[in-house]
Amino acid sequence: MIRPYLVALLMAFAIITPAAAQPGSASSIPQSALVQPEELAASLKAGQKPVILQVGFRKMYDEAHIPGALYAGPTGKEDGIAQLKTAAASLDKTKSVVIYCGCCPWSRCPNIAAAWKTLSELGFTQLKVLYIPNNFGADWAEKGYPVVHG
């Protein structure tokens, strides 16, 4: 009799737990650090060009990316973190930097939190994260925001 209740309780806990901000998850990034796609697109259109780093997979970058974005490696892996650190080494830590991935839904992105943590620890003071809730195609390209192919 107790077993079904225990199973139900454990299932409820499993459902609720991922919603909490966990270290290493995108939800651990402060809301104040997020920039919405329409905000970044408007800034680019107005000529305000932050340094933009794509921290996802190379194939995605090659298929389509934000104009001017630099590829900085898939930061969900150690070699990607090393690649990001190399890309960041030549950047002014006081200038505006926007990072994005867009490989998958925000809550499952393996790259964005690691990139945020790495650049924050390196001392970047004007660091923002492009909030892409679904994926780059749906939340940027299909909305008509500027894209470079290749």
What are these regions (language model features)?
Residues 1-7:
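Bacterial N-terminal signal peptides that target proteins for export
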Residues 8-17:
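Bacterial N-terminal signal peptides
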Residues 14, 54-55, 130:
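Active-site-adjacent beta-strand anchor residues
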Residues 17-34, 62-150:
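Rhodanese-like catalytic fold shared by cysteine-dependent sulfurtransferases
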Residues 31-43:
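A short, well-structured juxtamembrane/interface segment
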Residues 40, 51-56, 69-72:
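Short hydrophobic beta-strand that contains or immediately precedes a catalytic carboxylate
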Residues 41-46, 87:
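Short amphipathic alpha-helices and their capping/turn segments at secondary-structure boundaries
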Residues 44-52, 68, 126:
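Short active-site oxyanion
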